[in-house]
């Protein structure tokens, strides 16, 4: 997939964040400001570099930092890291991810109000199986 934004939407979300997790932050902010996220499966895009190509196994623990940037809070970060650890069959990912989360827990890349919106949306999705 490729991300496209209306100019007004892009301006309202403040552009793209220069941080780990930017590709999730923009989607949360789009929803926070009341814009819609749409996927056009008929649009054909050729990526010259595969998504995630530069990831190395150790970088997955940086997800804890990304969760801190997005304001997930401890419990959502823990749940997300456990899910990643199970998916990648790597229990160390949970431990290392929590260390990264703890180190960066005060480095929000969104406002407190936006972080609250993100947490509320995530809990709703989890509790309603969406």
Q: Where are the language model's segments positioned?
A:
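Residues that recognize and position ribonucleotide moieties
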Residues: 3, 38, 68
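Conserved nucleotide-sugar donor-binding
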Residues: 1-14
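Outer-membrane beta-barrel translocator/channel fold
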Residues: 51-55
């Amino acid at each position: 997939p490729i991300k496209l934004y209306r100019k007004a939407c892009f301006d309202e979300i403040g552009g793209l964040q220069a941080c780990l997790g930017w590709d999730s932050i923009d989607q949360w902010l789009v929803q926070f400001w009341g814009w819609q996220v749409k996927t056009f499966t008929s649009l054909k895009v050729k990526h010259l570099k595969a998504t995630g190509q530069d990831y190395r196994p150790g970088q997955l623990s940086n997800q804890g930092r990304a969760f801190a940037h997005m304001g997930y809070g401890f419990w959502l970060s823990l749940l997300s890291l456990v899910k990643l650890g199970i998916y990648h069959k790597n229990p160390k990912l949970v431990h290392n991810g929590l260390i990264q989360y703890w180190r960066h827990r005060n480095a929000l890349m969104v406002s407190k109000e936006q972080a609250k919106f993100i947490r509320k949306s995530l809990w709703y999705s989890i509790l309603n199986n969406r």
